Every structure is written in C-alpha cells, then in structure tokens.
C-alpha cells in the first residue's frame, strides 16, 4: 500500500462525511463523487508539483470547490430549463 492509498483510506470517509454535512444528505452521491475527483486530481497535480504542505486541506478544498461548481451548474441549468419552458408556454398559439 503506497502513500496515496494510505491517504485515501485515512481521509476519504471523513471528507465524505464533512461534505455531506455541508451539502446535505440528499447530496451523498455528489460528496462521494467529488472526493474521488479530488484524489484523482491530486494524483495528476502532485506528480508534477509535489504534495502540498497540508494534503488533507488541499483535498478537502478541491472537493468542496468541485461540489459548489457542480451544484451551481445544476441550478443554472435547471433555471434555464424552467425559463425555456415558461417561454414556450406563453408563446404557444392556441389555434
């Protein structure tokens, strides 16, 4: 088991729990996904830049920022879909 495996085993559960508290239990799958994304990103970035001074904080910040980005995108997409639906209802010719 390498250092990245050890870090994952030590941090992943805690990160998912923290993100679930922040974003709600209804976003559990999102929390799991962004934790995986953060670890994948770490493997890519740290290979070239080296691990940061506080890898746990880096991972949590990366995962939290990714979750916020995804939720914003979903909210924006939902809002745009409702706007299009609203416009199509008002522009429908009754004939």
Regions found by a protein language model. Name each.
Residues 12, 51, 56-60, 78-84:
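Key residue(s) within conserved catalytic/signature motifs
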Residues 15, 19, 59, 63-71:
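Hydrophobic-face residues of short alpha-helical interaction/recognition segments
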Residues 32-33, 37, 69:
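Acidic active-site catalytic centers that drive phospho-/nucleotidyl reactions
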Residues 95:
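Glycine-rich active-site/cofactor-binding loop and its immediate structural neighborhood
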